[in-house]
Amino acid sequence: MNIKLDKVSARHPAAKRDAAAALRGVSLEVSAGEQIAVIGPSGAGKTTLLHVLGCALPPSSGSLQLNARDPWRLPRSKLQLLRGELFLAPQVPPLPPRQRVVTSVLAGRLPHIGLWQSLRSLFYPTAIAQADAALARFDLSDKLFARVDRLSGGERQRVGLARALVTEASLLLVDEPLSALDPTRGQQAIASLTQAARERGATLVSTLHHVEMALQNFPRIIGLRDGELAFDLPAAQVTPERLQALYAQHLHELTGPAHEAFDLPAAATPPAVMHCR
């Protein structure tokens, strides 16, 4: 799916009137099949950008075009059809606790099948092999018929990502897919997502706190800070100096593997602290 943002600003409905917009004047273009990582400190507007791209939040100014169509100018019925071409994976996947994993994974197919088949699949899943194959990419085949409430936090996150592998959406929007995963599982998850998107020519946009993972796995990197576009560059051109400027006053978010990889000056590095994300 092709994407075009032209000077887009966005404000959350619950935000106070005098609060700054979560996104401010962001312009960018994405070609069908591109894979992009969005990085930046906490509160930079990364999740808001995904919500705008996923037609979950309308721009307060500027324009969004998906495949040369402004979704907010479409009739409601056509907007719903367009949303069926989008897949938004939130950081915490909304998985019903008593639901079987196979049903949760196959929920990714619901926008692409008929109403009757959707209802039937809630009780009698009909694409079990597809769900099993998706879970296998995340080493979760043994959880196919487990209940969601018996899973760990990391397993639930991987189940949410497995949905992206069964959907037929042409735009995958993935919010912080590694927040509950260790480095090994995180690399596995990113590899599975990028490979699946590449296989079917889908556009992939993912927000990431793990800067090193973003630079190693995505050819194009978008940096956001305070709701504004700081840079839009090939991964090879994202230098340590650019990262220091992007994360100024937030350098603790660069600690860990990404920090070591870029060998940031010790004088600029605050003491290491633990974060729960």
Swiss-Prot record:
Stored InterPro entries: AAA+_ATPase (IPR003593), ABC_transporter-like_ATP-bd (IPR003439), ABC_transporter-like_CS (IPR017871), P-loop_NTPase (IPR027417)
Pfam families according to UniProt: ABC_tran (PF00005)
UniProt: ATP binding residues: 40-47
UniProt GO MF annotations: ABC-type phosphonate transporter activity; ATP binding; ATP hydrolysis activity
Main location: membrane
Class in the EC hierarchy, top level: translocase
Residue ranges annotated for the ABC transporter domain, each copy included: 3-251
Membrane topology: Peripheral membrane protein
Reaction catalyzed: phosphonate(out) + ATP + H2O = phosphonate(in) + ADP + phosphate + H(+)
Keywords: ATP-binding, Cell inner membrane, Cell membrane, Membrane, Nucleotide-binding, Phosphonate transport, Translocase, Transport
Annotated EC: 7.3.2.2
Recorded GO CC terms: plasma membrane
Cellular localization per UniProt: Cell inner membrane
Origin superkingdom: Bacteria
Subunit structure: The complex is composed of two ATP-binding proteins (PhnC), two transmembrane proteins (PhnE) and a solute-binding protein (PhnD).
Family: Belongs to the ABC transporter superfamily. Phosphonates importer (TC 3.A.1.9.1) family.
Function: Part of the ABC transporter complex PhnCDE involved in phosphonates import. Responsible for energy coupling to the transport system.
PANTHER family, per database record: HEMIN IMPORT ATP-BINDING PROTEIN HMUV
Protein name: Phosphonates import ATP-binding protein PhnC
Native source organism of the sequence: Polaromonas sp. (strain JS666 / ATCC BAA-500)
